[in-house]
Amino acid sequence: MKYPKQIRTYCPFCKRHTIHKVEKVKKRPRSELSAGQRRFRRKLKGYTGFPRPNPAGREKPVKKLDLRFRCTVCGKAHTRGQGFRVKKFELVEV
């Protein structure tokens, strides 16, 4: 899917329609020191199996896109609804 790099949309911070830059957010590595991750690692120790139901077969083939719209006037970014599923995504100049 081709999506424009700049789009004119409503800015909830300026409270008016302005030009926004569209940016695709990259997934960051998960923190190994978070409380949930430490609990999970403790659970994996020993002679046990996987502590949760196996997600194979239930997971979706494609993740949802995380798009941020950054206002060129105030510089703040916001999302617009939920993401959508798409295999190929490309930002293009219009």
UniProtKB/Swiss-Prot annotation:
Cofactor note: Binds 1 zinc ion per subunit.
Gene3D superfamilies: 3.10.450.80
GO terms for MF: large ribosomal subunit rRNA binding; structural constituent of ribosome; zinc ion binding
UniProt organism field: Thermococcus kodakarensis (strain ATCC BAA-918 / JCM 12380 / KOD1) (Pyrococcus kodakaraensis (strain KOD1))
NCBIfam families named among the record's database cross-references: PRK05767.1
Record protein name field: Large ribosomal subunit protein eL42
Alphabetic keyword roster: Metal-binding, Ribonucleoprotein, Ribosomal protein, RNA-binding, rRNA-binding, Zinc, Zinc-finger
Residue intervals of every C4-type zinc finger in the record: 11-74
